[in-house]
Amino acid sequence: MAAPKRKKSKAKTAMRKAQWMRKLTVPGLSLCPECGQPKTPHRVCPHCGYYKDKEVVEVV
């Protein structure tokens, strides 16, 4: 099994662990055609309950 030849510094370890944060992307938002509120694509609108011009969930 491979073993490191030198100890990784705290800075190198922190840089490696911080890389996942740079890879994150903000989820795209689209506007609901029924109510005009922003929603995530391919999901039921949480404000009006519509998906593809059909009421899927009854929102009170």
Curated annotation (Swiss-Prot):
GO terms for cellular component: large ribosomal subunit. One of its GO terms (molecular function) is structural constituent of ribosome. One of its GO terms (biological process) is translation. Keywords: Ribonucleoprotein, Ribosomal protein. It holds the Pfam family Ribosomal_L32p. InterPro entries: Ribosomal_bL32 (IPR002677), Ribosomal_bL32_bact (IPR044957), Ribosomal_zn-bd (IPR011332). NCBIfam families: rpmF_bact. This is Large ribosomal subunit protein bL32.
